[in-house]
């Protein structure tokens, strides 16, 4: 139970708005998100929403329905003398009619599939499944290889920074292109982390070209214009 709210923490996290550790400014964290809004809004826009979790000693199960209007009492059971499996499982039935749909569209399905691959690529130590099939990505390099015709054209490195992985290839768009993640959150517009790595690569590469090919006048900006950069970063925020 939560010390002050007098309710189980899973119910507080998944069934009540404005409850999340991200509200606190003190301390640093390596997570993203919007105060748990994703899970709560999923509950609100679902006909049925079930949370199951276990710490190996106790299992917890709770069900909401009717767009979070109805909340059943949680089922809490001891695992007994034998230490059980630690897990968290969220199952939901989206209220498609609320959005004017009768089935999940191909566009939404493709978006979900892309996000599943994002999760697998950023967390290679976690088994991630899509429609019951294991997404076989053993590293961020494997994930980056999905975006180029030839995986051998991708150069990868961790830069010696824990939580960072970088992959770079030539851009097929004849201009600087990129995708990136910060704390497992997709940063489609890039940002300081992308510019930092791009400049870190382009400047010395331009110098190397100038030294080995004096007749060429290549600038870092020109190198960057032919770069396809993929970055996974962990940043304390």
Tell what function each PLM region has.
Residues 16, 65-67, 93-95, 169-171, ...:
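Generic beta-structure capping elements
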Residues 17-25, 205-212:
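Structural motif corresponding to the C-terminal cap of alpha-helices
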Residues 1-9, 20-146:
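GHKL-type ATPase core
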Residues 72-76, 109-237:
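GHKL/Histidine-kinase-like ATPase module
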Residues 13, 45, 50, 196, ...:
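Pseudouridine synthase
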């Amino acid at each position: 139970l939560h010390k002050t709210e007098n309710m189980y923490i899973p119910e507080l996290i998944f069934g009540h708005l404005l409850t999340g550790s991200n509200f606190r400014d003190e301390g640093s964290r390596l997570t993203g998100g919007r105060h748990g809004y994703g899970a709560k809004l999923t509950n609100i826009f679902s006909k049925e929403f079930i949370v199951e979790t276990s710490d190996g000693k106790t299992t917890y199960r709770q069900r909401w329905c009717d767009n979070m209007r109805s909340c059943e009492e949680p089922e809490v059971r001891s695992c007994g003398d034998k230490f059980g499996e630690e897990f968290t499982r969220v199952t939901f039935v989206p209220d498609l009619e609320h959005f004017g749909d009768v089935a999940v569209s191909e566009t939404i399905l493709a978006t979900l599939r892309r996000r599943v691959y994002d999760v697998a690529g950023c967390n290679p130590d976690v088994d991630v499944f899509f429609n019951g099939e294991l997404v076989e990505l053993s590293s961020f390099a494997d994930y980056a290889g999905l975006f180029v015709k030839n995986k051998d054209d991708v150069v990868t490195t961790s830069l010696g920074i824990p939580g960072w992985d970088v992959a770079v290839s030539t851009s097929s768009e004849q201009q600087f292109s990129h995708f990136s993640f910060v704390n497992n959150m997709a940063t489609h517009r890039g940002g300081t982390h992308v510019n930092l790595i791009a400049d870190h690569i382009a400047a010395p590469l331009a110098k190397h070209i100038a030294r080995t090919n004096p007749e060429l006048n290549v600038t870092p900006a020109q190198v960057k214009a032919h770069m396809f950069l993929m970055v996974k970063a962990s940043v304390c925020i």
